[in-house]
């Protein structure tokens, strides 16, 4: 895909819908960056801590800054973090998925439908390679997103002082 024009230079089945898996977290991160502030406090619910690996492993009630959780999300692809962020920004996972789908429509990602914030399998949670290219291109225009994904490692701490190393 040409970054300036958005034209697809080469594609193979680029319009075929497929599960998104962890590329979903690109949209989760972008929405959090656009609809919250880095210093906001985000807590882990029982739903968040119940997510399967890969996960941060925080306990129910643990609180972190949004900035730290976005690093957890993008550096190590933590499923529990995605749910905590989604519940904070969207009020619920379902509310956040609605926001994800609204943003997808705004960006012209017409073959994309979000159900989860972490990319775990769910019926109807899918996109096409072409739409994912468009999303990645949009993401790379966000300086805060780029700063996060270019961070090689980071140690984050919850509000009780428990530290977690991200690499």
Show the residue positions of the predicted features.
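A short, well-structured edge-of-sheet supersecondary motif
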Residues: 1-11
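Active-site SXXK
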Residues: 6, 19-42, 132
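Solvent-exposed, polar/charged alpha-helical surfaces in well-ordered, non-transmembrane soluble domains
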Residues: 7, 30, 34, 67-71, ...
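Soluble non-cytosolic domains of exported or imported proteins
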Residues: 14-26, 60-68, 75-79, 90-98, ...
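Short, well-structured active-site flanking segments
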Residues: 34-47, 143-151
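Acidic helix-start/capping segments at beta-turn-to-alpha-helix junctions
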Residues: 43-54, 122, 156-157
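Conserved catalytic neighborhood of penicillin-recognizing serine enzymes
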Residues: 51-87, 163-167
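Penicillin-recognizing serine hydrolase domain
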Residues: 92-167
